[in-house]
Amino acid sequence: MQIRDAIITVTNRTDLSQDDAAAVMEQMMNGEATPAQIAALLTALHFKGETDAEIAGMAQVMRAKSLAVPHDGGVVDTCGTGGDHSNTFNISTTAAFVAAGAGATVAKHGNRAMSSKCGSADVLEGLGVNIELDAEGVARCLRQAGIGFMFAPKFHPAMRYAGPVRREIGIRTIFNVLGPLTNPARAEYQVIGVANAGLAEKLANALSKMGIRRALVVHGSDGLDEISISASTLVFDVRAGATPQASTISPSDFGLSLAPREAIAGGSVEENVAMTKAILEGSDTGPRRDIVLLNAAAALVACERADSFGEALRQAQQAIDTGSANQRMQRMIEASNG
């Protein structure tokens, strides 16, 4: 399908097939579509509403065109789609260190702040991590530290055609949800946080269509794009080719107390760096630690290092209490600057 035909199809509120969405994405990524055509299609998809098949088709192409990171397999990514405007501290980034401390290999894919003051790239840079690594540099971090970071702008050169357009039109587009699905390390396991319940189900179905080995797509009922400490969380358990299974979990299921959203609020880069350090060093034992434990546990379940959330939570607690999580952070800083 040509992009002009796709624009007409979507404007008529007809969905694209996964193959047609992929074909159109190829044209956008290869520079075969004009800026006007890209803007028209993105806007039409926005108002029609993107389907899981459209998301899967476009994500497969975008991921295939990213700069691949070599590794030995079995890596997990933890990230959110953003857009919850919650201004929390960097939960998934801190949880990534804890998951690594518990033995997972974490290939984190992220960017600078979108809906908060401090994104994953910002806090990692503040901690002393070199975020400007190429694929081999990230691979070195994975080998030496068990955790690496792929700064999205460096790994998606094909976005040079669509990137300026999506910024200029100024609305949320399908690209806002493609990021977590396009990990350059081709992560076999994922935890993806989503601020909208309907979108969570779409992403779960898209991941299944893309053949993910296992993923958890989570949505806090308070609107958080993480597993929440302030409310229950909707969890879609995704396995390749299978219908995602939905369930609900609550902090109380694991003996953790509910806490108000203000208790996990973030601040400036410097403040968020201090919060991450306090959790990993073991000096913060309050709600911030608890929400990190829950989200690290999700990563351990997703990458099948634990059979249950309860077991995963114990592994996450041990990773902090033994100093292993903090050690992973220090190793990542060293490896990224090596």
From Swiss-Prot:
Its EC number is 2.4.2.18. The keyword Metal-binding applies. Mg(2+) 2 binds at D225, E226. The keyword Magnesium applies. Pfam families: Glycos_trans_3N, Glycos_transf_3. GO terms for biological process: L-tryptophan biosynthetic process. It comes from the Bacteria. It is an enzyme of class 2 (transferase). Binds 2 magnesium ions per monomer. Pathway: Amino-acid biosynthesis; L-tryptophan biosynthesis; L-tryptophan from chorismate: step 2/5. 5-phospho-alpha-D-ribose 1-diphosphate binds at residues 80, 83-84, 88, 90-93, 108-116, 120. Anthranilate 1 binds at G80, N111. One of its GO terms (molecular function) is anthranilate phosphoribosyltransferase activity. It catalyses: N-(5-phospho-beta-D-ribosyl)anthranilate + diphosphate = 5-phospho-alpha-D-ribose 1-diphosphate + anthranilate. GO terms for cellular component: cytosol. Anthranilate 2 binds at R166. Mg(2+) 1 binds at S92, E226. Its cofactor is Mg(2+). HAMAP family: TrpD. Belongs to the anthranilate phosphoribosyltransferase family. Catalyzes the transfer of the phosphoribosyl group of 5-phosphorylribose-1-pyrophosphate (PRPP) to anthranilate to yield N-(5'-phosphoribosyl)-anthranilate (PRA). Homodimer. NCBIfam families: trpD. This is Anthranilate phosphoribosyltransferase. It comes from Herpetosiphon aurantiacus (strain ATCC 23779 / DSM 785 / 114-95).
